[in-house]
Amino acid sequence: MDIRILIDKLGPITNSEITLKPFMVFTGESGLGKSYTAFLVYNLTSALTAIRMQEFVEQKVKGNKLELDVKFKDFRLWLNNNTSAYLGYLLGYSDFSCHVNYVFDLDDDMPLHVKCLDDDETTSFSRCSMNGKTEVFPMHLADQTLLMSITLNKYLAEKIFNQPYFFQLLLPPARAAFIGSNTTTPIGMYREFLRQFDDLKTPSRVASPDIQLYSNYIARLVDGKIVVENGNIFIVFESGAKIPVSAAASSVKELMPF
């Protein structure tokens, strides 16, 4: 699917348009707005996670906590109208303002009907219907807006990205100084990065069959392997040399997922 972002005003960028691709590189001199453009991609992927989707759901359900009945246009307008606030959060600048428009190859009138289904006889799972199709979750979620958010974000992510779930990643500029620190920061992009970094350091209780595949790709990319020792992440090269990730963190200036 083509996803276009029409930029009327975004920092130094005016009257421009970009089409999102699976891999994009923004190059040029400092001050051209490369970081702002990359943040637009992160804004979209983060909007398709349950946490931010819950903001949309809570705004639309009103008094009915069990059912959401909107159209895709409602989500698209919410995304466009909240871009300034979210980029301001990432930048730590509450007065940040921009004018952009996300355009999708989806019908604006596509129905988005989400409904929580009551299960009075069991507390071991939850059910929610998405446009009439029942989704079953192997857990009991008392927060019904969260349940609807998870259901809706899975549906829209599959429509937009052709995959129901994904792990978003944010590598902001000058992040190396924050690795290993115990400080907090009001700047959203560093808070997001540190949260994701902590998640990556935490070992999973369930072994994934894809781990070796990913490990092989990482080894090819960095000519070595990633190891975790005493809660710290290191890159170990084939020569045996080892450096902490904090020392290599700025070798890739900035990265956003798509």
Q: Would you name each region that the model predicts?
A:
Residues Y190-V236, V245:
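ABC-family P-loop ATPase nucleotide-binding domains
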Residues L20, P164-F166, L221-V222, E229-N230, ...:
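Short, well-ordered loop/turn elements at secondary-structure boundaries
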Residues L170, L213-Y217, P257:
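Amphipathic alpha-helical segments that form well-ordered structural scaffolds
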Residues V41-L44, G240-K242, A247-F258:
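GG-anchored amphipathic helix commonly corresponding to the ABC/SMC/Rad50 NBD signature/C-loop
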Residues M1-R195, K201-A207, F237:
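P-loop NTPase switch/coupling surface
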